[in-house]
Amino acid sequence: MLKLTILGSGTSCGIPVIGCDCPVCTSTDPRDKRLRTSALIETGEGGTILIDCGPDFRQQMLRLPRAVRPDAVLLTHKHHDHVGGIDDLRPFGWPDAVQIYADEDCADDVRSRFPYSFVENKYPGVPNLELHTLHPLQSCRIAGTEVLPLPVMHGKLPILGFRIGGLVYITDISALPPEAVPYASGASILVLGALRHKPHHSHETVEEACALAQRLQARDTYLIHMCHDM
């Protein structure tokens, strides 16, 4: 049985935002302490998949049992809050390279951010990474389970969501292309980005996300990538 752990549900700045004295950032409620958005999936078939690897990755992993290690990493897109922690994958790259899956744009960005991991003669101790290119609506087997990349729009940037069995995971969404709707529908669990109530050019509002969730008719829906406005 698939197990989902939300490692972080915050937006790009994290919550609390540094230097902010708003009610959410000064709150003592633990639900208002949100690391950058990421998730860990234990597939039930012996595999463990990490979705996104942001700047809080090290802190997120230290909260988990030491035996937990990702067999593969799925990247939704190239923004720093989703890839900025890739250097901290280095403990998991031995003896075998960490398998990272992303669309072509994101894969190119990872190579440019972490060039020392992709040279022929690597310096000892750098992250041992192997990149694979994903294409929307072309399923592939990753860490022993079937993964379907979903096309998603993040403002003008095409990014990826994922369907893994009964789970649909979509962050940083401003629109779901019509061709993705049938594949994103009817999930047991829908994880969906919802930035805030006020409109934003590259993220859905809470109201827009709830309307999309009704269309997709998942059994349970969880909202992520929430900023300090709520």
Name every feature range the model reports, one short phrase each.
Residues 1-170:
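Binuclear metal-dependent hydrolase catalytic cores
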Residues 175-230:
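Cap/insert and terminal regions of metallo-dependent hydrolase folds
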